[in-house]
Amino acid sequence: MTIAPSAPRAESDPSDTGIETGGPGAALLRTLTELTADLPDTDPGRVAAAALRGRSAAADEAELRALATEAAAGLISEDPAYSRLAARLLTLAVTEEAAGQGATSFSASVAVGHREGLIADRTAEFVALHASRLDALVEHTLAEGADDRFGFFGLRTLHSRYLLRHPITRQVVETPQHFMLRVACGLAADESVQAVEEVASLYRLMSRLDYLPSSPTLFNSGTRHPQMSSCYLLDSPLDELDSIYDRYHQVARLSKHAGGIGLSYSRIRARGSLIRGTNGHSNGIVPFLKTLDASVAAVNQGGRRKGAAAVYLETWHADIEEFLELRDNTGEDQRRTHNLNLAHWVPDEFMRRVNADADWSLFSPADVPELVDLWGDEFDAAYRKAEAEGLARKTMPARDLYGRMMRTLAQTGQGWMTFKDASNRTANQTAEPGTVVHSSNLCTEIIEVTNDGETAVCNLGSVNMGAFVVDGEIDWERLDETVRTAVTFLDRVVDINFYPTEQAGRSNARWRPVGLGAMGLQDVFFKLRMPFDSPEAKALSTKLSERIMLAAYEASCDLAERSGPLPAWEQTRTARGVLHPDHFDVELNWPERWDALRARIAKSGMRNSLLLAIAPTATIASIAGVYECIEPQVSNLFKRETLSGEFLQVNAYLVEELKNLGVWDAQTREALRESSGSVQGFGWIPAEVRELYRTAWEIPQRGLIDMAAARTPFLDQAQSLNLFLETPTIGKLSSMYAYAWKQGLKTTYYLRSRPATKIARAASGSAVPAAAAPLPQAVDADALACSLENPESCEACQ
C-alpha cells in the first residue's frame, strides 16, 4: 500500500499538525525538520502526518521513520526534493541496521563480513593492515556529503540488492560507503601504501558517482567468490553430442556466478540432416535449445536473479524459420523457449540480397561447416560456391525471410539484429586468419573472438558523463583522470577474477579485454540544453566518445609500459599500427595526442586488446541517479515499484524548468499523468522546452542510429542500442534496420514498443490490463519493398 500524504501544511510545528508534543510523532517531526532544512520545497509536517496515519499502535521511532520514508517517496512526483528526503531517511535506517550487526566503521564491517564467511581472506587482511587510514577515508568522505548524493530509488536499489547481508539475520553488514570501499579494496594490487592510494582513488570516483563498475564487480569484489566479469561469449558447440552437453555444463557454471551468456549455435546441423552414426535424421537445433532454456532458468545467478543467455544464429542456417518461432506464445511448447534471448548474426550478403530483392539460400552446417568461420569476401565466395554446388536445403526470397525477422521483432522485441561482417571487419582481435567473432553477448555490446577452447570474457564499468558537466562545459581533464583510474581497475579484474571455467580463464589471460562504457548522456544534454537529436548533441556525443577512447588507450599504454603488453599482442591489429578509428573516415579532435599515443604504442604496445563497450547500465544508472547509457529518456514520468506499492518519479530537470516558468502546479502534474509523461501537447510551455524534453518515442529513430554510427569509430567493441517504436510495422522496421546496417552499426539490441496504457491509471491502483500494440500478422510485401527502396523517406527514421 502506498501512503497518500494529505494536502500541504504551511507550518511544521507539532501543534499545527495534530502531533502529540513529546511523543514519537514529535521526535519524527524534529528529525524531518532537520533533514529538510536545505530542502525548502518539502513539507516535513505533511510527511509526518502521513506517517502517523499509517502507524500501528506499538510503532517505535524506526517504524515511524520507515513510514515517513514511504510517505516522502509518494511525493516525489510532486517535487524531486522529496527523493532527497526519502534517501536521507533511508540512510539513517541503513546505518542503524548495519550498526546493529556490529558494522560501526568500515574496518568493523569487513571484520563482520569475514567472520560470517562473506569477505575473502585477502581483502580482510588488506583492510586490517590499513584499518585506521581506510576508516578515516570513509569518515572524511561522509563529511563531504557522500551519502547525500543518492536519490531514494538508487539508494533503495543498493540496500535491497547490493549490500552484503548477514547469512542468518539477513540484516545488512555494510553501509553504502562501506560497500563502495569494500569493492575498491577487493581490487587492491597488493598490501602496499601505494595500493591504498590506488584504492582511495577508485573509492572517491565511486562515492562521487563519477564511475561505477558493473553489477558482478559490485556484487562480488572482495568476497570469497570474486567473479566480477559481466559477459561470457561461447562459440557454438561442435556438431556432436559430447560437445553440446559440455556447453550446457559450461553455461551452467558461468550463469551460477552471475555471468550473462552469449552463445552461438550455428555449427549444429539442421533438422532433417543425416546422422551417420545411427542412419537417422537430426531434429535440428530446437530440441537442444529447449534443454538449454530449462538449464538457464534453473541455474540462478548467485541467488539474486535468473540466469540469462542470448543464442545467436547465422541467417543462412536452415533452422532459421523455426528459430524465429522460439518465443511465440502459440504452437507446440516443446518447440518454444521462454527464457532464452534470440539474436541474428547477419552477414552483409544477406542484407545486399534483401536490398536487391534476390533469393537467399539456407544450408545445414553439416554441408557447409566452413561458413561459420568466414566473414567478408571469403564468406561471400564460399556461400556462393555452396549455392552453385546445389548444397542449399531451401531457397526463398531474401525479403520474405527479412520480413519474418521484422515480424518477430515487432511481436516479441527479440531476434536482435547484429551484423557479422561489421563486427569482424574492425575488431582488434581478428587480425590473423582463424580468429573470428562468432556472436555478441547477452546485451550486444561485446565483440570478441571465440573458439571451442576459448570463452571470451569482458569486465565492464561505466563513466557517468553527466557528472562532468561543470558550469556549462565538459571538464575534460577530470574525465581523463576518471578514465585512467577506471581502466587500471578494469584491467586489475583480469588478474584477480574468479573464472568458473578453464576456457574463460585462458581467454581472458590471453586477450585481456575490458569494456569501459558510459551512462548519463541524456543528463549531459539536459544540463547543456541540447535536444537529443540535434547536430550539437551528435557532435558532443562523438567528441565524448573520442576523448574516452583516447584516455583509455593512453591508460592501457601506461599499463603496458609497467607490466608488458597483452600475451596476444602480436595477433592484434593495433600491433600492426592500425587503431580502431583508422577504419573510418573521421576527423580527430585531438590529432597531436593521437600521434603521441601511436608512437608510444609502437614502442610499448598495449595491455588490453579491447577497451570500450557501452553496456545498458540499467541498475548502476539507477544507483547513480542518471539516465541509462547512451539512451534518451523514455518518459518524463515513470513508475517505480517497491514492496509497499508503486510510486511515480518525475524528470527533475523538467520540474526545475517548469518551476522557473511558474507552471509547475497541480494542473501541469495532472496533465503529465494523463499524457503518460509527454509534454508535447503542453501549449502553455515554450516550444524549445517541449523539444528538449521529448521522449525516446518522440525522437526520430534515424537520429539515434546516426548518433550511434558517429560514435562507432571510438568504440572498439560495440554498444547496446535500443530502438523505440510505439506501433511497429513491417515497413517501419525493415527500413530502420536496413538503415542501421548501411550506417555501419555492429549491433542493435531490443526493439521497444509500448502498450497503450496510462501512467495515471497504473499508479492509482485501478490499472487495466495492458493492451498490446497492434502488430502485423503477415508480411506486407509492398510496404516492405517501399521502405527498403526509399529508406530516406521512411517515417520510422524521420
Q: Each PLM stretch: what is its role?
A:
Residues 1-798:
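Extended catalytic cores of very large enzyme megasubunits
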